[in-house]
């Protein structure tokens, strides 16, 4: 029986465990692992095996959207401010340094290969060029002592001043609400895709996993609840969410087009 257990870092502080179920995983194996996670004081969610599972796929869209904004010429401090205003526990450029751009690059390369091997056409995210540039100039992560932020004796000090010149910061400044929505909607849309593809089998797991595992703002109720509970200028609920997603798609790219579901 194959079954995976995905803990979150730091393990002693993060309450969530993502249980990964294979095609032939027995109910008995699942029940035993579920009980084990409860016994060690963790909150489990169950997902079906796929590339990135659920949480890694979704948090990647949050980070990617922030990096895309940086590549568009948005001020780095404005991006961090938008992340904080949206309600995330860590702003996206800071989080990217922790996640490690070299790892993100490897994931993008593997994703491209997976899509192309399956006969599909890979559509690179605008964030990939930013990741490659940062690696090229030797600023891949906090681990290496240099990323989007500067580090002194391992401690984060300030945003690296060279970001402004490297990415021509200040040449673009979208509305703050657009910046906030790009982050929130990117994760919500990816969550819906996970539900559509059967990676997730319940919206409850989506909401619990997104809040407790990857820091989706708690006031939203979770990345699935955000869709049905969305409140915007065009109204309230799923129809309003879809309308706003289409607005974002028209301005920032097809990745914001909502699925038919």
Protein language model regions, located:
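N-terminal glycine-rich phosphate-binding loop for ADP-containing cofactors
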Residues: 1-261
